[in-house]
């Protein structure tokens, strides 16, 4: 389907959550870690963490023997990850919030590392629109992007209120999550940051990253770097097409920043 990335949604907002007894990435050796999808920023970042700690990502059938330095990657829906961790089916998972915060709240896991502390200001979710709409309904398309940019700006300035609105206690029950879980993500206490600095979940304090933040402009340099990293990432299935992708051309071909530029200028 002809479509374009027209904006970023949020940056950061993900983490590697592990069983309570694990305090180092190296302890994941010989165990299984869940990812939400092979083609995800989560898979890219967790494999970088593995390499940095002398671990080798593999994809093997459940119950297969693993090498001493191997970590088996399994794909799970995000909502299945906390129960799988609690039941010890997996030793950890990497995913978007609030499923890391949920594990903390349920005391079934701890955040080993935030992805935004590994890859600074990385995009997670993006806004992807049909090219037909962009070309044939430009005014409507502009209104969509304007609304998203305004929502991002409002959320940045009203984090606690956003957590309440999005929670199961909010008037519209947008998510099934408790307010305190979403507060951990959107409006964390200052003491939380100190604890993460002490544990090593945050190692680049000078980056001053939020647990989740919002920045709509789709920087080409990020898309180029993502294409480069995907080429060296373990991905199930036929990933041969990645070898032929030129990062700079892909960034230009995949992204249409006309609408987000206008939206940013209007707020």
Predicted regions mapped to residue ranges:
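Residue-level preference for alpha-helix termini and adjacent loops
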Residues: 5, 15, 21, 126, ...
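Pocket-lining segment of extracytoplasmic ligand-binding domains
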Residues: 74, 78-186
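C-terminal non-catalytic accessory extensions
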Residues: 253-267
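Short, glycine-/small- and polar/acidic-enriched structural segments
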Residues: 1-76, 81-87, 91-101, 108-121
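Secondary-structure end/capping motifs
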Residues: 135-243
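Aspartic protease catalytic domain
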Residues: 243-244, 248-252
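Electropositive, surface-exposed helix/loop patches at the edges of structured domains
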Residues: 22, 149, 153, 267
